[in-house]
């Protein structure tokens, strides 16, 4: 890895050689794919007005499905000054449209992970590959719970298919921005270390 103007970049031939020579490869990818698709869809549905609503959704202000969360969501929608069409589109997205986005994104994420596992195995058939699963960054959204359960099931099957070790991380402690806390990172590290072959 090198940097140019503070931006990290990778020299692909060097990276490929390092992967070919590695004894252990850990892989944790695709976690943001669904969140980014949801943000884009909500922005399109509300002509860009939904940013004010997405911030509390994605920063963890609304972590649980309770009265306070529903009131915050309702107030957030009211404060967006949406047209009736935009409100209808936003509510449809939060109701049933998100499931379609999750299904499409999950299929693409699984395909991407499979392609990466194929390439890693071609480069290094003998390395231990540890494929880390996913935690749910938005636990109050039932669609996301289903999405991440199915995604973990699919990725675990891929790990078995390509001779990788799957590591589950469902109890990751999450910060307000949806990313693991320091304790969450330590938990993930402990789960990975348990899977490392001696």
Language model: regions and residue ranges:
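Extracellular/periplasmic catalytic domains that process cell-envelope and extracellular macromolecules
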Residues: 17-21, 123, 160-161
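Histidine-centered active-site loop/cap adjacent to the catalytic His
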Residues: 23, 156, 176-198
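Surface-exposed cleft-lining segments at the edges of enzyme active sites
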Residues: 90-110, 138-144, 176-177
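Generic structural signal for well-ordered alpha-helices
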Residues: 113-117, 152
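Surface-exposed amphipathic alpha-helices with a cationic face
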Residues: 117-124
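Substrate-gating cap/lid alpha-helix
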Residues: 136-169
